[in-house]
Every structure is written in structure tokens, then in C-alpha cells.
Curated annotation (Swiss-Prot):
Protein name: Homeobox protein Hox-B2
Biased segments, Low complexity type: 106-136, 227-240
Entry's Gene Ontology BP terms: anterior/posterior pattern specification; dorsal/ventral pattern formation; embryonic skeletal system morphogenesis; facial nerve structural organization; morphogenesis of an epithelial sheet; nervous system development; neural nucleus development; positive regulation of transcription by RNA polymerase II
Source organism (scientific name): Homo sapiens
CDD domains: homeodomain
DNA-binding listed as a keyword: yes
Chain positions found as Phosphoserine: 274
Family: Belongs to the Antp homeobox family. Proboscipedia subfamily.
Compositional bias of kind Polar residues: 52-66
Amino acid sequence: MNFEFEREIGFINSQPSLAECLTSFPAVLETFQTSSIKESTLIPPPPPFEQTFPSLQPGASTLQRPRSQKRAEDGPALPPPPPPPLPAAPPAPEFPWMKEKKSAKKPSQSATSPSPAASAVPASGVGSPADGLGLPEAGGGGARRLRTAYTNTQLLELEKEFHFNKYLCRPRRVEIAALLDLTERQVKVWFQNRRMKHKRQTQHREPPDGEPACPGALEDICDPAEEPAASPGGPSASRAAWEACCHPPEVVPGALSADPRPLAVRLEGAGASSPGCALRGAGGLEPGPLPEDVFSGRQDSPFLPDLNFFAADSCLQLSGGLSPSLQGSLDSPVPFSEEELDFFTSTLCAIDLQFP
């Protein structure tokens, strides 16, 4: 018996209940209670299940049933609310401009689909007279796209009127519109387009009339009378020589006859003052001597009227007073070509103009 009792006790103790565990372990009980108390003080209590789950509320069944009943009752009544806007759409009447668009040969997208202004009026439900009057004006833009075909008689009369007066007063415009079987708007638009065409034509004609001013300015720049005012420096002197080459007939005769001094003296002074010009005049690209036979063969040239005395011995005499580079070019055996000789003579004439 004792064995069985102990066995039973051991069986019971082998599977203790939760209450026995809590009573046998007071520390666990205290920690459980204190932790639950702390959590209850720190964390706000959650809402009751009745609030989180409305169906658990005592009156939820009674409240939700009426809602469901109301929804069931409103369900068949949902289509009727859209019909109120539908009756509002017919109040927008069909204006004449709508019919014109539909009957036009090239119907635009606005003819098939209502315009924004027309759709805005039914949506807002405002049928004021001002909005109704504004619709034809909005559609007037579509009507203006249609091109008006004027007859020859109408064009002739309009051109005649435009010739006398480019701007029409309203009484005259009404009179012409009635005479030509046109609307006042068509006459006004035709005159606007005709004025723009006239403006373009006059603008294209003006540039040719204003062009002659440019050549005159160029003539003033290239006037040979301003050449003596050039400075004796190298670049300006070379530019003057180049301009003298461009106008040899105008420069050479007057230059040679204006200064009675011998050419040798003039050449010596020019070589001492501006060696750059003298070097270029002496054929800086292909230097060579000035033999006597070259001048004898070129005496008939109009550019050499006063060079008969310019012989080889005079060149040797002049070489002493010229720069070393010019002297070397005179001693070179390479002969001058005719083009280089012409350039040389014209350069000498330009130097005479700079140093009178």
C-alpha cells in the first residue's frame, strides 16, 4: 500500500500543475506579477475587442444588419443617380455652328467629339445665357478654318477698294459686304490678309533700293587720294604698294610727272627710310640684277616712261647707298620676269607717292 501510495504520489508529482509550480516557486510568481504590472503601466491598454472587431460588439449585429439592408435597398437605386446628369446634357442646344461642322466636307475632331467648352457647360450644369453666347464664339475658330472661295468679280472689287484705301471703316465694310454678297467678317479678314501680303512685298523691295550705299562706302575706302596719308611704316607701306598695284593706270603717270627729281635719288631715299618696301620692290621673292637689256626690251611698256637712263652702271652706283639685302639682290645672277618687273615699277611709284 505504501508503495502504491508513493507511486501515486510520485506520479502526481511527476506531472505538477501550473498552480503547484507557481506556489512552489514564489520567485517565478513575483516576477510574473511584477512584469505584468510593469507592462500594464508602461504600455497603454489595447482597445477592447469590441472596438477592433465591430462584429463582436453587442449591437453590431443590429447595426450591421440595417447597413446591409440599406445597401441592399440602395443597390438597385445606384443606376438612377447617373441619370440626373443625363437629363442635364440635353439642355445644351445644338447651335448653328455645330450643324455647319457636321455638314462640312472635312469634319474636324471637334465635330465628332464635343468641344471642351461644350462639355464643361453640361458638367457644371450652368446654363446661363453668357455661356450659351460664348459657345458660338468658341466654335468660330473652327468655322474660320474653312477657306472662302472668292469669285473673280469679288476679288476684282476687293483689290480695287484696297488700291484706294487699305483700311476700311465699318460703314464702308458693310456696304462692300452687301454689294459682293459676303459677310462683314469675310471682308475684314480679306483686308487683313491683303495688308500682310502688301507689307511682305514692300519689305522685299526695300533692300535693293538701299544697296547702292555700300559701293559708295567701298569707293571711299579705296580712293587713291587717301594713299599719300599712309604712314611710312612697313605694313602700311606694303598695303599702299598693293593698292597701287590694283590701280596702276591711275597712279603711275601722275606720280612720275609730279616729282622732277631723278629716280635714282628717289629710290635711294626710299631705300634708306623704308628698307622693307625697297626689299620688296627689288624682288624679295626672287632677287636678281637689273640688266640693261631688260630695260631696253621693256621701253615700250606704259609703266616705264622715265626709266631710259636707268642702266646697269647706275644700279651699281645706287647699290652703295642701299641696304645690304638689296645690294645682294642686285648682284644675284637670276633675271627678272616681266611680271616681277611690272610689280617693281608699280612699287616704285607707290614709294614716290609716300615720299614726295
